[in-house]
Amino acid sequence: MDDALAHLPRAFAGKTVLVLGDVMLDRFIYGAVDRISPEAPVPVIAVEKETAMLGGAGNVARNVAALGAKAVLIGLVGRDDAGAALRGMIDAEAGLEAELVVDPARRTTEKVRYISGSHQMLRVDREDRSPGDGAALLAAFETRLASADVVVLSDYAKGVLTPAVVRGAIDAAKAAGKPVIVDPKSRDFARYDGATLIKPNRKEAAEATGIVETSDAASEDAGAAILAMAPGLQAALITRGGAGMTLAVRNQPPIHLPATAIEVFDVSGAGDTVAATLALAVAAGASLAQAAQLANLAGGLVVAKLGTDVVTAAELTACASSAQGEPGEIKIADREQAQRIVEGWRARGLKVGFTNGCFDLLHPGHVSLLSQAKAACDRLIVGLNTDASVSKLKGPTRPVQKEQGRATVLASLSSVDLVVLFDEDTPLELIKAFRPDVLVKGADYTVETVVGSDVVLGYGGKVVLAELKQGQSTTNLIARMNS
């Protein structure tokens, strides 16, 4: 893994990405399925939760903003409830601006997904694919082009990126010296000639080239065929799902990148995350190979999340900093990030455990407790007292190690899946937020005296008291060191 990758996300701040494409509203309806309809052989979903978010080109822009940069979104909406919802979401999104062309006669594109557990049961599309007002779209694009560092064309074949609009946008960007990243939908890849990089998935590449991707060699052939279609195109990055990605750069040998996702929960919007990361990496001065590597990591992160989600700069930096660059190595999270990770674990039916402590000078007693805690669950969260919290509990000479050092040591253990810092005297708020299936403390406590035991037992969880290793304590260690 390129050592420079971990530093790239820090360079995203201050960059502006101009996104032109098909904006849509993504709605997710979650529920339980426990019976078949008596009216027809179809499952009945008992709706539990509904969410809505920016989709399509809007999700590219949302990912840009989440990565710490500024996104300017150019798209097309109708004068309807879905269009109004999209405009409201854009206004509420930090780091995101938009120039939306409104067509009163048009329906705003909307995708509704019905999800139960880890399965998408049904998708309902409401859309108008007729060509939009190309002149108005290009006028908005050209107005914002000068302030952009890079351009993304996000094509979902919903009427925005007609051949004329694509040609006008690429020509204007080239004249202004702006790189162009294309997420294509048309089978005619020649229309994207002059772009910096095109990012088809395996299906789109096969439809455009006639080469079905069955191996690395076939993917190399497809990449070469794409470059032959568009002489002015610099590179093609074919995303291949579980097989990873293949990067074909003109006059360079192809590069194969293995998939990085450890667990795949939802691929919705993953291509948008990849496109946003590619664009920002290129804007930050990365080579196309580096940009592809970073985008590959981002794609692996986002498919492990629920619904159309985003990747943050902090998550990407942590992932790129790990030895293998694997999403599973991201173990230190803030409360909000941890909440999303836990939701994903729970949606996959994993048993979540929780323990907590200061873990100032890690010793065999700590290691034993953590090993026992992990044995009682599938994923273990460690709530870690911040420096201020430790000082309040243990006195002004503690902690010996600062919180970041303590978190890093804990995160290096195979028994620990997630470390979350907390400032409070007790981890009660974390326990209420994460609702662990198993709460673990040392056997020097009783079940009744474990903080949060009443909460966990109240919703049917379990409290485990781990056996202690005699004579092991941080206080004793410090005393021996000072004697």
UniProtKB/Swiss-Prot annotation:
Q: Where is this region: Cytidylyltransferase?
A: 354-483
Q: Name one GO biological process term.
A: ADP-L-glycero-beta-D-manno-heptose biosynthetic process
Pathway assigned in UniProt: Nucleotide-sugar biosynthesis; ADP-L-glycero-beta-D-manno-heptose biosynthesis; ADP-L-glycero-beta-D-manno-heptose from D-glycero-beta-D-manno-heptose 7-phosphate: step 1/4; Nucleotide-sugar biosynthesis; ADP-L-glycero-beta-D-manno-heptose biosynthesis; ADP-L-glycero-beta-D-manno-heptose from D-glycero-beta-D-manno-heptose 7-phosphate: step 3/4
Region annotation Ribokinase: residue ranges?
1-327
Recorded E.C. number(s)? 2.7.1.167, 2.7.7.70
The UniProt keyword set, sorted, is:
ATP-binding, Carbohydrate metabolism, Kinase, Multifunctional enzyme, Nucleotide-binding, Nucleotidyltransferase, Transferase
Q: Which InterPro entries match?
A: Bifunc_HldE, Carboh/pur_kinase_PfkB_CS, Cyt_trans-like, PfkB_dom, RfaE_dom_I, RfaE_dom_II, Ribokinase-like, Rossmann-like_a/b/a_fold
Annotated residues for binding of ATP: N201, R202, K203, E204
Catalytic activity reads: D-glycero-beta-D-manno-heptose 7-phosphate + ATP = D-glycero-beta-D-manno-heptose 1,7-bisphosphate + ADP + H(+); D-glycero-beta-D-manno-heptose 1-phosphate + ATP + H(+) = ADP-D-glycero-beta-D-manno-heptose + diphosphate
Name a GO molecular-function annotation: ATP binding
One Pfam family matching this protein = CTP_transf_like
Q: Does the keyword section mention Nucleotidyltransferase?
A: yes
Q: Which family does it belong to?
A: In the N-terminal section; belongs to the carbohydrate kinase PfkB family. In the C-terminal section; belongs to the cytidylyltransferase family.
PANTHER family for the chain: BIFUNCTIONAL PROTEIN HLDE
Physiological role? Catalyzes the ADP transfer from ATP to D-glycero-beta-D-manno-heptose 1-phosphate, yielding ADP-D-glycero-beta-D-manno-heptose.
Subunit details for this protein?
Homodimer.
Instruction: Write the protein's name.
Output: Bifunctional protein HldE
Query: What organism does this protein naturally occur in?
Result: Caulobacter vibrioides (strain ATCC 19089 / CIP 103742 / CB 15)
Name of the gene: hldE
